[in-house]
Amino acid sequence: MKRGSGTVDGVKDTKQVNQTKQVIPIRCEGVAVILLKKNLDQYHVLMLKRASRMLHNEWCYIGGGIEMGEKAWEAALREIREETGITEVRLYSANQFEQYYSPMEDYTYTAPVFVGYVDESQPVQLNHEHSDYQWMTFDEAKENAALPGIDHILDFVEKHFAKKAPSKWLRIDGKI
């Protein structure tokens, strides 16, 4: 290595790169959950209308923060229970991540996506975060989704969780 060249055998010294470029943090502080219910041989997606200030009156799927000491899948089960009152669900990791950039705080938010299958008899009881809910087809959910990118996640879930059985390796055996 030549003194001051910033390379070792042609590879940039990462310390020097970090001193010359701005790093934007990536935060994984929450989870996203897509609940599926079969109706007449077709899966429907639970979409919730937001009542809070953020994304007010927009349709979204379940999501929320991960509490201190909690695993992501535990947060997913808790958010399902808190936002919908649903207590019986077969949960899977979607092996996907929801992500967006926050210009106000200059960071990238990322959240693991989970998929839950619920029995058609499970009632939905909304909490204060939502004003309405609908079980939508995948096309309806994509059309009504609040943010760009959600359609890609819904396409993935439809392909790998609705049109065929999910991989047994993605099953999560936790309890609500």
Language-model-detected regions and their locations in the chain:
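Intrinsic disorder/low-complexity segments enriched in small, polar and charged residues
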Residues: 4-5, 11
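Conserved N-terminal beta-strand and adjoining loop/helix that marks the start
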Residues: 14-45
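A generic fold-level signal
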Residues: 26-28, 40, 54, 106-109, ...
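Active-site segment of metal-dependent pyrophosphate-handling enzymes
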Residues: 27, 85-122
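Short, well-ordered beta-strand micro-motif
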Residues: 35-37, 49, 113-117, 137
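Nudix hydrolase/Nudix homology domain
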Residues: 54-56, 127-176
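Short aromatic/basic micro-patch
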Residues: 60, 108, 135
